[in-house]
Amino acid sequence: MALKITQHKGLVGANPKQRKNMAALGLKHINHSVVHQDTPVVRGMVNVVRHMVSVEEVAGE
């Protein structure tokens, strides 16, 4: 199972922890999407920025 993560809000006003998590996820700008494996590490990073992103489960690796 994989997760499609899409950034919906910008980083203006975000704290440094949120900025680092967005960079670690590979998200650079609004409406940018990335696909990551569904792991506890990725889920934790998404949880930190949950108000800035949307998450969908997609099939595949």
Swiss-Prot record:
GO biological process: translation
Protein name as it appears in the record: Large ribosomal subunit protein uL30
One annotated Gene Ontology cellular component of this protein: cytosolic large ribosomal subunit
Entry similarity comment: Belongs to the universal ribosomal protein uL30 family.
Key words of the record: Ribonucleoprotein, Ribosomal protein
GO molecular function: structural constituent of ribosome
A Pfam family recorded for this sequence: Ribosomal_L30
Subunit structure: Part of the 50S ribosomal subunit.
